[in-house]
Amino acid sequence: MNTLPDECVQSLIAFASVSLEGKSQRSISNLCKFRCGLFDGKKRYHLFRETAFLNLFVIHAVCRTMNVPSEKINAAFNYIYRLKFQGKENMNTWFSDLLKRIDAYVETGTEKETGGGFAIAGLFLLNLKSFDKTLPGFEQISVAEYVSKLFAVLTQTMEKYR
């Protein structure tokens, strides 16, 4: 199996850890230039640095609060990676299609597969794209409102699937 998702997860974990250590946003933004082919600068896969920082900070905080093992997050990211980055998606319906796939997977998966880490990985990618104005189907909201909503949703999801 391609090790790319595992490499990405390690980069994400390192990125979140630095953010929690109080580094400057410039330093954090520089870390967002992951040494990972997924983030290759193509418009479709572009990560906004500020958005990545906010997502990772909130996700990492929720994981620590809920005692989610990194193995669950890693397995979840691998699954989401296979769903999203196969290059066959209709970008006009990508958001709703992925939500349906995640719902179906959670309904049919085992307890281990549907752990909180899966929900975190899915929400990370879905919410990250909400800041990308080049993709259809997303509303723009303020950063403060976004962080508040993301933290609430992640916490609720963790309680449901852990």
Mark where each language-model region is:
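An acidic intrinsically disordered interaction segment
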Residues: 2-30, 93
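Extended, well-ordered alpha-helical scaffold segments
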Residues: 8-13, 72-84
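N-terminal interaction modules that seed assembly of large macromolecular complexes
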Residues: 22-68
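Eukaryote-specific, cytoplasm-facing alpha-helical/coiled-coil scaffolding segments in long proteins
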Residues: 38-42, 76-89
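Residues within HEAT/ARM-like alpha-solenoid scaffolds
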Residues: 46-50, 72-75, 89-97
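Short, solvent-exposed secondary-structure capping/transition elements
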Residues: 60-75, 86-90
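Helix-driven interaction modules
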Residues: 83-162
